[in-house]
């Protein structure tokens, strides 16, 4: 990922939450093995009584009103996303966590560009499940809260934390739907969230563990276990050379770790000759910046510079699990960007697969170099759509932060499909410009056909997209710059601090809707 020189599903663990706890503590610790998360809505009017969800009402009736009675004396009404824990109310559930869902009527917010009700459910359920885990209970049953898919996503995303390499593990918590509600929607939510968690795990794993070869092997294992309608090709350096991918090879040559070109196929369409959608993901498994080396502070985060490859591959694995009736191909050029005597030097000129020459004025703008060859190769499949994802520019983080993925596309149809999918998932996208204004800044090049950085410091995300456009002739292409959404501090309440796996769920939703539209 090129950073502008500006003036900086596994086991689970949670932090202690500031919650109120009420009820009898007479049950022994040995009895406390299962928890329950129930939702309650905010008051619509000042004089209203906060309303339980349907599951909450039924549970309160089972207790002859004791849940409501205990809630009324426990403090002020619960705000959205807040939790309150009660003990000893029911023998099957020694701990019951009430979670605030906000207003029941919450729907699509046209300013926020998401479904507020679904986001409230995800955040509330995540907080409730973390509280159950914090109590060291091994299982939790979850109120569907009116949307079982959103509830499942909140539970599975909220409970995930990467601790694979720690000796001391926190207790894993299994979550399931409370009652006999919409199991199909719940399982769909589990699938969507598990797809994102796969991307999170790939992105979080240290670079000495997550090499290009290891990444490819993990995706191969996951894809083959997801469906029999799949093919995986782990292409070695010799194949990359045969394909004349000189731009990709120029980045890889600085590292002793061999490059891999991962090519995955999901053949879900009943028509084997149906043109596929092609997803392309940047797969830099560690980005030091090369000779244009990065500052050491936070360089460790560049283990996730393969986030584009992680998200597109995880989305395809999820599509295979959903058995979608479409054909999809995933392409991921995988390598490290390291400094050495063999590495690219500023001012070098390399040749891409389509014959265009590239002046490499900044070796830290390497993602676009490997994507250039992959995008050229993507055209050989006669695709319906080409979509690439990449943690491409620090400028994208400056522009949008973690609020949304930046989308550059030559197709309003494709933009609308991605935008609609993002409203559903809450993992938002925002359209960015592909003006000729930016193209001129990369094709005005002294030594080659195109420069890998723009003439000016401004609009770095836009000039990076303009560079990629030089290797695209397809009329339905989108470039997703995910640099700003790569990590989470506390912005997304149902994701812990760390790598996010965004926007995997939006890509899955896009594929699902595309398959339905083309049925």
From Swiss-Prot:
Its cofactor is Zn(2+); Mn(2+). The modification Phosphoserine is found at residues 42, 54, 180, 194, 238. Homohexamer. One of its GO terms (molecular function) is carboxypeptidase activity. Cytosolic metallopeptidase that catalyzes the removal of unsubstituted N-terminal hydrophobic amino acids from various peptides. The presence of Zn(2+) ions is essential for the peptidase activity, and the association with other cofactors can modulate the substrate spectificity of the enzyme. For instance, in the presence of Mn(2+), it displays a specific Cys-Gly hydrolyzing activity of Cys-Gly-S-conjugates. Involved in the metabolism of glutathione and in the degradation of glutathione S-conjugates, which may play a role in the control of the cell redox status. PANTHER family: CYTOSOL AMINOPEPTIDASE, LEUCINE AMINOPEPTIDASE-RELATED. The modification N6-succinyllysine is found at residues 45, 61, 103, 221, 455, 476, 489. This is Cytosol aminopeptidase. Zn(2+) 1 binds at residues 287, 364, 366. It comes from Homo sapiens. Mg(2+) binds at residues 287, 364, 366. Its EC number is 3.4.11.1, 3.4.13.23, 3.4.11.5. Zn(2+) 2 binds at residues 282, 287, 305, 366. Substrate binds at residues 282, 287, 292, 294, 305, 364. InterPro entries: Leucine_aapep/pepB, Macro_dom-like, Peptidase_M17_C, Peptidase_M17_leu_NH2_pept, Peptidase_M17_N. Its main location: cytoplasm. Zn(2+) 3 binds at residues 202-203, 205, 303.
């Amino acid at each position: 990922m090129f950073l502008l020189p500006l003036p900086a599903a596994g086991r689970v663990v949670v932090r202690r939450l500031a919650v109120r706890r009420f009820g009898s503590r007479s049950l022994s610790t040995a009895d406390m093995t299962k928890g329950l998360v129930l939702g309650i809505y905010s008051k619509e009017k000042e004089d209203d009584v906060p309303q339980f969800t349907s599951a909450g009402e039924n549970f309160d009736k089972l207790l002859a009103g004791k849940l409501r009675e205990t809630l009324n004396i426990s403090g002020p009404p619960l705000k959205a996303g807040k939790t309150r824990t009660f003990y000893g109310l029911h023998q099957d559930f020694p701990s019951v966590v009430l979670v605030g869902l906000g207003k029941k009527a919450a729907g699509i917010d046209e300013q926020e560009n998401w479904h507020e009700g679904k986001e409230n459910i995800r955040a509330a359920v995540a907080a409730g499940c973390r509280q159950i885990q914090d109590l060291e209970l091994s299982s939790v049953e979850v109120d569907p809260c009116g949307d079982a898919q959103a509830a499942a996503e909140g539970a599975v995303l909220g409970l995930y934390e990467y601790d694979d390499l720690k000796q001391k593990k926190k207790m894993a918590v299994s979550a399931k739907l409370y009652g006999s509600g919409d199991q199909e929607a719940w399982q769909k939510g589990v699938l969507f969230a598990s797809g994102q968690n796969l991307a999170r795990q790939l992105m979080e794993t240290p670079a000495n563990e997550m090499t290009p070869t290891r990444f490819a092997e993990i995706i191969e294992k996951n894809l083959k276990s997801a469906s029999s309608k799949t093919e995986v090709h782990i292409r070695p350096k010799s194949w990359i050379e045969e394909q004349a991918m000189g731009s990709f090879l120029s980045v890889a040559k600085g590292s002793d770790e061999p490059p891999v070109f991962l090519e995955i196929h999901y053949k879900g369409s009943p028509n084997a000759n149906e043109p596929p959608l092609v997803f392309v993901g940047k797969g830099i498994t560690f980005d030091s910046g090369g000779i244009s080396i990065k500052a050491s502070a936070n360089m460790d985060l560049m283990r996730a510079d393969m986030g584009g490859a992680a998200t597109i591959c995880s989305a395809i694995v999820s599509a295979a699990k959903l058995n979608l009736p479409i054909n999809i191909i995933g392409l991921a050029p995988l390598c490290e960007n390291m400094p050495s005597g063999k590495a690219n030097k500023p001012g070098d000129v390399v040749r891409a697969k389509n014959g265009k020459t590239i002046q490499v004025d900044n070796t830290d703008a390497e993602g676009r170099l490997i994507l250039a060859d992959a995008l050229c190769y993507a055209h050989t499949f006669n695709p319906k759509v080409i979509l690439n994802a990449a943690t491409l520019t620090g400028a994208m983080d400056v522009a949008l932060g973690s609020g949304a993925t930046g989308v550059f596309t030559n197709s309003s149809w494709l933009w609308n499909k991605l935008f609609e999918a993002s409203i559903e998932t809450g993992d938002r996208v925002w359209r960015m410009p592909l003006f000729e204004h930016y193209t001129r800044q990369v094709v005005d090049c002294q030594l080659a056909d195109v420069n890998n950085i723009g003439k000016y410091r401004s609009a770095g995300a836009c000039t990076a997209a303009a560079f990629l456009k030089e290797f695209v002739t397809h009329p339905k292409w989108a470039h997703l710059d995910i640099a700003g959404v790569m990590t989470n501090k506390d912005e997304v309440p149902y994701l812990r601090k760390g790598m996010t796996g965004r926007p995997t769920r939006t890509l899955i939703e896009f594929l699902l809707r595309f398959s339905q539209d083309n049925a």
